[in-house]
Amino acid sequence: MSQRPNPSALIWLLLSALVVGLDQWSKAWVLSSLPEYTPVPVIDGFWNWYRTYNTGAAFSFLSDAGGWQLWFFTALAVGISGLLAFWLSRTARGQWRSALPYALVIGGAIGNVIDRLMHGHVVDFIQWYIGSHTWPSFNIADSAIVGGAIGIAVFGLFDKSDKQQPGTGNLR
């Protein structure tokens, strides 16, 4: 008698789609409503809307590299998203500690890929600062990628469900 396979975590790709949708909706709002390179205060002394563009990666890494970085970061994001989607397909639906961060990274990566392909750069608009110390501008996709990466690291370090139980020789 064959055992029915566990449903995969691919349903979590709906979260990825939600991240992409919110990211693209927010960027459409930014492009239609905010002036370029002009702070619009949200919370004085801490948070502005600030429409800017990034042709590189996090913290504008390689933004002045001459154009090849557009295709490099696009290919990297698509490759990582594909790998994470494959891992989702091999993950049980209830394994949210793996599925949630994978889905967040996929959604964020695809959101920024859409920007790169449509605009040639990523649209950033959230600016946090204290006094004269400003954090680099970012967007919803970036937030999802960072949240997912933190989740992968934290749950990977502290989740013992896949580890061998001491003295039993059996996996949990």
Curated annotation (Swiss-Prot):
It holds the Pfam family Peptidase_A8. Keywords: Aspartyl protease, Cell inner membrane, Cell membrane, Hydrolase, Membrane, Protease, Transmembrane, Transmembrane helix. It is an enzyme of class 3 (hydrolase). Its EC number is 3.4.23.36. Belongs to the peptidase A8 family. GO terms for molecular function: aspartic-type endopeptidase activity. It is found in: Cell inner membrane. Its main location: membrane. HAMAP family: LspA (MF_00161). The active site is at D124, D142. The gene is lspA. The chain crosses the membrane at residues 10-30, 68-88, 98-118, 138-158. It comes from Xanthomonas axonopodis pv. citri (strain 306). It is a multi-pass membrane protein. This protein specifically catalyzes the removal of signal peptides from prolipoproteins. Pathway: Protein modification; lipoprotein biosynthesis (signal peptide cleavage). The lineage of its organism: Bacteria, Pseudomonadati, Pseudomonadota, Gammaproteobacteria, Lysobacterales. GO terms for biological process: proteolysis. It catalyses: Release of signal peptides from bacterial membrane prolipoproteins. Hydrolyzes -Xaa-Yaa-Zaa-|-(S,diacylglyceryl)Cys-, in which Xaa is hydrophobic (preferably Leu), and Yaa (Ala or Ser) and Zaa (Gly or Ala) have small, neutral side chains. This is Lipoprotein signal peptidase. It comes from the Bacteria. One of its GO terms (cellular component) is plasma membrane.
